[in-house]
């Protein structure tokens, strides 16, 4: 399930410390925010945080870097029914 290890070359100065770019490459939980969430939990303020790619649920994190779970305080991501950031605590991804 090796995904986007090459994406680690993307260095976004706005990424949150929670969002570990290096954690990409597997679908397992490598930080407090499971990569299964698409990486969106840690980078609510990240600009082009492509880490939302995680499982391909949200290929374009957009300016809000929603990731697969609505990102950090963002809302309305169809992939998770708009849980709006609850993923950061685990519930939306079932962590």
From Swiss-Prot:
* Organism domain of life: Eukaryota
InterPro entries attached to this UniProt entry: HssA/B-like_chaperone, HssA/B-related
Annotated region (Disordered) at: 1-31
Any GO BP: sorocarp development
Query: Which Pfam families has this protein been placed in?
Result: Coiled
- Tell me which family the UniProt entry assigns to this protein: Belongs to the hssA/B family.
The name under which this protein is listed is HssA/B-like protein 45
């Amino acid at each position: 399930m090796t995904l986007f290890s090459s994406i680690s070359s993307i260095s976004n100065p706005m990424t949150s410390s929670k969002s570990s770019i290096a954690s990409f490459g597997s679908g397992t939980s490598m930080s407090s925010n499971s990569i299964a969430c698409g990486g969106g939990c840690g980078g609510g303020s990240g600009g082009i945080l492509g880490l939302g790619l995680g499982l391909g649920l949200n290929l374009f994190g957009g300016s809000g870097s929603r990731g697969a779970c609505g990102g950090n305080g963002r809302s309305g991501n169809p992939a998770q029914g708009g849980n709006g950031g609850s993923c950061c605590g685990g519930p939306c991804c079932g962590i």
